[in-house]
Amino acid sequence: VLAYCREKGYYLQLYVGDSILIKQENDCSRMYTKISGIQTTAIGDALYHTDEEPYKILVMTKSEEFAEVWQQFKQDFAGKLDVTSSKDNFLELMEPGVNKWEAVKSVAASYGVQPQEIMCIGDSNNDVKMIANAGIGVAVANAKDSVKQNAKIITASNNDDGVAMVIESILTPQAAE
């Protein structure tokens, strides 16, 4: 994957432990830090030769290229990577079976909570498996269509307190009446 990204000239970030590794600081890394508030660590060409095992690789593309790049990754790495996105130009690459739903399910199981007892709320493509499998899958109004199509409930936008509204309605059923 790293050689493929280097050959194609894609900006990428490796998520290793508590660090996000990049080749060099540039407009993409600055945009990511501005959006997320998380700092990256530039390591030069060592990025392509690291012995570290990343749990996620983020590839940033231009918005107009995103759909094509996504499909290319899905085709070229079918069965080898799960390919999803969190923003219109953020492509997330992980090992098959590594996703938000598997993480939620694992934590819930450690507390004896069954999948049908779980409520998950989301808005992006990387939330689809979580929303589709949770007992109560909720999409906010400003979610991607793929999330809404898999949700049992669509609440108000996250900008209009949709998350708080749906949690309150579940915890206090009379509030919905």
Where do the protein language model's features map onto the residues?
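Conserved acidic, metal-coordinating active-site core of Asp-based
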Residues: 4-121, 130
